[in-house]
UniProtKB/Swiss-Prot annotation:
Protein name: Probable replication endonuclease from prophage-like region 2
Taxonomic lineage: Bacteria, Pseudomonadati, Pseudomonadota, Gammaproteobacteria, Enterobacterales
Domain of life: Bacteria
Organism for this UniProt entry: Salmonella typhi
Keyword Lyase: no
InterPro entries: Replication_gene_A-like (IPR008766)
Amino acid sequence: MAVSKITLHYAQTTGGSNEAAAAFPWNTPKKAVNPYLDPAEFAPESALSNLIALYAVDNEQEQLRRETLSDEVWERYFFNESRDPVQREMEQDRLINHAKTAREQQRFNPDLVIIANVGAQPAHISKPLLERIKYFHSLGRAKAYSRYLQKTIRPCLERLERVRDSQVSASFRFMASHDGLEGLLVLPEMNQDQVKRLSTLVAAHMSMCLDAACGDLFVSDDVKPEEIRQAWERVAAEAMRLEVIPPAFEQLRRKKRRRKPVPYELIPPSLARMLCADWWYRKLWQMRCEWREEQLRAVCLVNKKASPYVSYEAVIHKREQRRKSLEFFRSHELINEDGDTLDMEDVVNASNSNPAHRRNEMMACVKGLELIAEMRGDCAVFYTITCPSRFHATLNNGRPNPKWTSATVRQSSDYLVDTFAAFRKAMHKAGLRWYGVRVAEPHHDGTVHWHLLCFMRKKDRRSITALLRKFAIREDREELGANTGPRFKPELINPRKGTPTSYIAKYISKNIDGRGLAKEISKETGRSLRDSAEHVSAWASLHRVQQFRFFGIPGRQAYRELRLLAGQAARVQGERKAGAPVLDNPRLDAVLAAADAGCFATYIMKQGGVLVPRKHHLVRTAYELNDEPSAYGDHGIRIYGIWSPIAEGKICTHAVKWKKVRKAVDVQEAAADQGACAPWTRTRTRGNNCPPVENLNKSGGDLPDIKTMNEKELQDYLHNMGQKERRELTARLRLVKPKRKTVYKQNISEQQRLQLEAELTARGFEGSASEIDLLLRGGSIPSGAGLRIFYRNHRLQEDDKWRQ
């Protein structure tokens, strides 16, 4: 108690002295001089000391980097198992023990063998399979997990080996044995850069083969054409070892009964292609994609449970290819000799390459067939033909098909083509005729099947149906039994249910762009037909399957050329009397008028009608050789116009020659895109650094001001303008930026705005006010893979055709 009182008294005394010191600053105690405790107050930092400290830090970091690099070099080149016998022996013992342990585990658990085999596969096979195995393992059902490995994964691996053996033949392996061509054995695992390098090596090998053949065959200076053909045969034989058909092979190969002389002029272009690395790249890349897709089909990664019709990898590649094509079209334009320009994107969208135009033309053609059938009193039958079970890789439940014989998608298409050719030959021999259209589309595993809309005489319907059934089920007949429906299904079209056009409309739209099928659900895949259209398009492009084919009617290319001619005549003649003839021959003018009106039924009847041989058609497509040779020295064939056997000469519909050029770049936008280095870049170029406007003013400064002219003076000036002045005027007009159209803005409620913000957030976007305002004004946001997000009809949609 006494100690606490003394302590309290001492604290009060000390506190009072401190308060007095705080009141008078001269009474504060002085700090002891000790440079070791606080040297900063007595040694202020200078610029030199800071620089020395920075150098010291840099030296320490450099020393640490050198020590780390020295340790890495020591570990890699001096202290490793290849140079240290003791460490090498220890590493070998560790690997042997690990292998023994794994072998013991696999003997007691066969599932581990399957997982190990899956892990040994390439990444495009092992990664998706391991994800599925991991998912089944996470379910916690041991028996189902083991059954999945034994009944699904193991058969898939066995099928994969059979597919690889069928892809790589003995001759292909022989070619891969040459120096530098070992990559042919792993072609499906390569990317584009690797395939490009491999194609260069293959082209070099073909060049060496040609040099060796020339050295053996060309013994004298007077080389005969037959000796050149023998040298070509040697190079062609090497190309055929790679499962590639040489160019012009059918025309140049040896035949026992040749009716025409050998076209020796085709040998140089054929050799130029077989010695070109770009040509080999296209062939090898196509082969790589097909082989890779067939391997994915073998392991059940192409079906309605995984990816219908085609693999996701092929769909993504098709999207990227479409995106690059759109960028190319938007960056180029077409120009003629007069300086007139056309936007290349507008030209492509206005052509038959536009899916909407292609669909409309096909629907118009089918409608014309329907009208002709009504006029003739013919009946319409809808047929469905499917390949045998040995062509189907996957069952309907997504499991491997035990009857599959490693047949490819292309082989299934060839089977249907051969079957149809045999049936058509037998039908003509029996005196039966029909006309219509067929549509080729895939099953969920990619196997081809056909839908045919055929028109025929009512008295021939039973005979044609029975004959077609005979050819459709003649192979593997025992697997069908009494029910032939899975292979062949006929359906007589009932006018009460719908017209023939309505029957085929869904299949046409489904295989082009899925227009109008957003609410239609596929019975086979369970997905929307509009969403499946992208997969179907990628499937047809990858496997080179012709989706649509009309038969028994005149060609549609002449129809397109006639419509083009009618449009050109209307522009040239100006205001002419409605119905005035364009062609002198009234029969040809009637065909032209029918095509211009868009009536396929009238066009077909004016051409001669259905079931008429091609040699009796009035109007046909005319072709000619290109003026300029290709990169391989040959002149390709292009469309010239139309011609008719009842009239002399040809009519040209492509008189103006257009050249593809890159669009002019806006200098201000290009400089803004270059950033801070733009001024240096402009001043360091060797060419003229003036903007295009200044260059144009220097070269064409004597051009009059068009703005000050009235309408009559402007017409006279444009009429008397020379070619050089016209080009300069076109260049000036090209620099004028078009005025932006006033965009609209959609009005939505607050609830719809909140819903739009939530949907954007769910898709991975910020959902900010700027993004919502952009969508409401008709804009779009890129979402990856060439697709864009846009807001239309109070719905958030994703498409790559949002501009149309």
